[in-house]
Regions:
Chain B
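Ubiquitin-like/PB1-type beta-grasp interaction modules and other compact soluble beta-rich domains
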Residues: 1-79
Length: 164, 80
């Protein structure tokens, strides 16, 4: 683990700030900066959504997100990848996830960013509970992280980690 | 031995609580602990799609349990 990885948790209850991620990853050999921000929508599968509550198994989630960052750096040969996800109650428009990738060129930055975001959505132990205008709620059906479950097709097509 | 189950996401709603203490025989595994939940029909339906963790480590169904373990039941995830 890199020393500067210890400076913050990948799971945060406070509103997410992009600036610290940009400052922590700044480097002169990277001409491409790719950023993804995932914000809360006011609808899902045709139903109006009033707000969300995210919960996470913080210790496992922090560990898995750090490993996704490392995989992303290794598999796409990009020097910087940072991901942070918010938990707690989020309103419409609030940012739930930031992912930042820096690379020498844009092609690997875009590919690495998609891998980082998709892997976080499919592997990090985070659960989204949607609340509706009538006060009811439901958990969004998600991705199984148990051994033996096949990843989605598009994740299979990405480069496989060579050293594990 | 005593083990505490911790339910996450929809499993907490289905279990009616986010924690449940269970008593198991010595040499029990994760599978033995989960077997105790199969009497709860709504929860049992979700279990085939759950993963399990102790602390910050995912564990397999044949992982041996120890006195005082906190075993997390992790349903399908939906972050992002």
């Amino acid at each position: 683990m890199r020393a500067d990885d210890l400076d913050y948790s990948r799971i945060q209850p406070e509103p997410l700030a992009l600036e610290p991620l940009l400052l922590a990853t700044e480097r002169p050999d990277c001409g491409a900066l790719a950023i993804f921000a995932g914000a809360v929508r006011n609808h899902h599968e045709g139903a109006a959504v009033s707000h969300l509550i995210y919960t996470a198994h913080a210790a496992l989630c922090d560990k898995i997100i750090r490993s996704i960052e490392q995989e992303t750096r290794e598999q796409f040969n990009v020097p910087e990848c940072r991901i942070v996800h918010r938990v707690g109650q989020l309103g419409i428009g609030d940012v739930a996830i930031y992912a930042v990738v820096r690379a020498p060129h844009r092609a690997e930055a875009f590919a690495a960013l998609r891998y980082a975001v998709d892997s976080t959505k499919h592997r990090a132990p985070i659960w989204k509970e949607e609340f509706y205008p009538d006060g009811s709620s439901s958990f969004v059906s998600g991705c199984c992280i148990a051994d033996g479950f096949e990843p989605p097709e598009y994740l299979k097509q990405l480069p496989q980690k060579a050293n594990t | 031995m005593n083990v505490e189950l911790q339910f996450w996401g929809v499993t907490a709603r289905l279990a009616g609580s986010d924690r449940r203490r269970v008593t198991l025989t010595e040499n029990a595994t994760v599978a033995d602990a989960i077997e105790l939940l199969r009497g709860d029909a709504a929860l049992a339906k979700e279990l085939p799609r759950c993963a399990y963790a102790i602390g910050a480590d995912l564990v397999a169904l044949d992982h041996p349990l120890s006195e005082g373990d906190e075993l997390s039941v992790l349903p399908p995830v939906s972050g992002g």
